Every structure is written in structure tokens, then in C-alpha cells.
Amino acid sequence: SEPRLFVRHKFSKQKSKAKLVRNLEWALDIDKVTEAIVEQGRCAISGRPFVYKTGSIDAPSIDRIDSERGYTPDNIMFVGAHINIMKGRLDLETFVNLCKDVAKFRSNEFG
């Protein structure tokens, strides 16, 4: 299906970048990752549904839980592309706490 093709294409490129550019371990099976992402259907952090379109802020992305480690089954979660960019190298607890601070500080502006 279209979501599966999108995910397979995107992560074959990410695998090459991880290995060649970043010299990171890649111990993921693309078929298993693809099925897991499509089954999950939404960002593990924000809960927003995945959008299977290049350039979408909600396109699925593989986040490394521990940014010092590679792409292994015990070190990944599936998140939206912009959540992954925003989180960067932060651990999940720090990222969520920062988001809470921003939401609290800006709550008067956006109701």
C-alpha cells in the first residue's frame, strides 16, 4: 500500500545516511519497521496521526531514544518528523518538560 511504500523508501535513505555519514549501527529490519509504523499509525510522543507525504511535519520518523547509540530495536521509537527535529538529542523527559514550560508560558496567547 502507499503508506508502506513511503516508509520503505524513506527509511532506506535513512539507513544509508546512518551508516555512511554518521557511522551509526543499523540493526533494523525494514519490513518489520514498516509494519510497526503503519500499525502504530501515530507519533509516540504527540499522538498526532502520521501523514505519509514527503515534507509533512507528521511524516513518520525513527527517533533514537539514546542519541549516543545506533538504530537498534531497543533504542527506537516512531515519531512525527518535526517532533524528531524538535527533540534533537534531548531525552524524552527533558523534551516533554520543556514542551510543558512553553505551553504554560504561552497559554494566554493561544487560549
Go through the PLM ranges and name each one.
Residues Y52-K53, M86-R89:
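Short, non-ligating residues that shape and space the ligands of small metal-coordination modules
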Residues V79-I83, N97-K100:
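Short, low-complexity, polar/charged sequence segments that are solvent-exposed and flexible
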Residues L24-V33, R42-A81:
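Histidine-centered nuclease catalytic patch
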Residues E68, I83-M86, F105:
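Hydrophobic alpha-helical segments
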